[in-house]
C-alpha cells in the first residue's frame, strides 16, 4: 500500500471520528478531537509489519489508549474514549485495510445507541447475552474499563453466534433515521448472517 493511500485512509479515519462525535459527545470540535487522536499510538497497530498482532497485545493497547485519552481530556469517559478509538480503527483498519496481520479479527465495534438497538432486536431471545451488552445503555454511562469489557464480552458472544468478526457486528447498527435496514447499501439488501442455533 502506498504512503499516499495510508495518509488518505488515516486522515479520513480522523474525520470519521470527528463526525461520530457530533451528537451528545462531550468533545466535538476539530481543535480538540484531532490533537487527542494524534496522542494515540495508532502506528503500533496500523504500520505495515509481518508481526501478527495477538489478542493480549491488542487488549492491552486498547485499554491503555482508552485510559490515556480519558487522562488527557477530563470531559471524556471510557465510553466516549473507546468510541473514538474504535471508530478510527474501524475506518483505518477494517474499511481502509491498514494494519498488522490479525488486526481486523480483533477490532471492537463502536458502542453506541445504534448498535445497542440492533443487538436488542437481533438477540431479543438471548437475555443472558443482552445482560452483558446492555449492562448500561448510554455511552456516558461506560465510566470504567471493566464495564466496557463486559459489553465487549457480550458482543463477542453475539459475533460468535452470527459467525462473524467482532467488528462485523456493525451489520446490526441501526441509524436514528433509517431503522433496521442496510447501512446505505448501494446494492440490493443482502440477507443477514444466519445465526447458529445452540
Language-model-detected regions and their locations in the chain:
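Phosphate/adenylate-binding glycine loop and adjacent helical scaffold
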Residues: 1-75
Amino acid at each position: 500500500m502506498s504512503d499516499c493511500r495510508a495518509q488518505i485512509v488515516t486522515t479520513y479515519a480522523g474525520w470519521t471520528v470527528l463526525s461520530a462525535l457530533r451528537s451528545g459527545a462531550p468533545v466535538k470540535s476539530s481543535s480538540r478531537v484531532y490533537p487527542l487522536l494524534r496522542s494515540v499510538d495508532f502506528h503500533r497497530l496500523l504500520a505495515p509489519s509481518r508481526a501478527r498482532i495477538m489478542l493480549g497485545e491488542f487488549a492491552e493497547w486498547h485499554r491503555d489508549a482508552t485510559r490515556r485519552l480519558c487522562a488527557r481530556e477530563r470531559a471524556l469517559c471510557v465510553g466516549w474514549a473507546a468510541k473514538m478509538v474504535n471508530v478510527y480503527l474501524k475506518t483505518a483498519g477494517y474499511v481502509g485495510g491498514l494494519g498488522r496481520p490479525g488486526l481486523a479479527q480483533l477490532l471492537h465495534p463502536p458502542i453506541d445507541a445504534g448498535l445497542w438497538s440492533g443487538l436488542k432486536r437481533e438477540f431479543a431471545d438471548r437475555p443472558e447475552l443482552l445482560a452483558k451488552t446492555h449492562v448500561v445503555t448510554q455511552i456516558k454511562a461506560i465510566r470504567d474499563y471493566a464495564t466496557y469489557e463486559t459489553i465487549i464480552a457480550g458482543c463477542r458472544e453475539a459475533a460468535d453466534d452470527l459467525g462473524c468478526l467482532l467488528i462485523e457486528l456493525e451489520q446490526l447498527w441501526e441509524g436514528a433515521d433509517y431503522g433496521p435496514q442496510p447501512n446505505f447499501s448501494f446494492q440490493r439488501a443482502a440477507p443477514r448472517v444466519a445465526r447458529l442455533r445452540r
